[in-house]
Amino acid sequence: MSDGGIEFFVLSGFLGSGKTTLLRDFLEQPEAADTAVIVNEVGEIGLDGIVLRDGGDSLPMAMLSNGCVCCQIGSDLAFTIDRLIVAKRPHGTPPLRRIILETSGLAKPGPVLRQLASLAEHRMKVAVVGTFDLTRGTETATFEEAVSQWAAAHRIAATKVDLASVNALSEAPATIAAINPLAEVIALKDRASTVATAFGPLVAAPPLPDVSADVKATHPRLVLCCARPVADISYPDLAAWLDNLAGALGDRLLRLKGLVQVKTLKQPLLIESVGTLFSPPRPLQMADGSQSSFLVIIAHDVMEAELGPIAPSGLFQFSSWQRPDAALRDERRVIKAEWVT
């Protein structure tokens, strides 16, 4: 986290996936004393807020109700965040360090993150925490919202561990990685350790994971592919291709992350998006000094044939995660990526 910057967590997960319980577990920890919470519910009665407030009313909390934060009450969200940041803290409490937004179970993270652009002056460090209900597994993948939530997440926490089988917990990392190989997976028995990791400091994202050759997408509409530059790329061509990719896929683009070496820079550029919202590209020093170029793309209802013609055409060749090569795995071990800001 940048000096003085507030950490902003978007807590995302499908209906009934355990978001409120996960948040409540965290708020019961001493480390949560410097936290403010925003709860968004689609409806006039904020039940989750009542549940979270049960047991104490010292927590700074704001309710956004009667509308989904990702599509209906964006201006209210920005106003609420700004109000929490500038508000005077109660005497004896630590400075505000962290804001957690618990979205409704139907909210997609991409539009939510886009609404934070007006708050750039606060220089917040932002990450999406997703929930994975062990008792339901990938059953909710039939819902577009659930797939979008998992794909956008930087961290995915397994929930309802006490209700799930031992096999469900042990298989969770592989199952989640097949949906979003870019996410840090949190599948722990201890609830305190789970929340400490889920809402832990945003100093740097973990390296891109080492995906083994037997990883397969768990949902037939989900596409996990890798784009490699065919030759040296200029920055204008890269920017145009990314812009056209976002335009061509629209909401079908769920997540993108990787490194691209451009002609005029010594270090590769870190490229990252949640949905069609791209973070500013930034040079990234590789741990071993190597220069690598590839983009991981997570999308749904997309055929590889759609990607090739995107202009400027011929910049990338595409391969599936089902057959990752050793060089790609080595590259992903040494990346020191940064969180979306």
Describe each model-derived feature in a short phrase.
Residues A152-A287, D301-T341:
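C-terminal accessory "lid"/substrate-recognition subdomains
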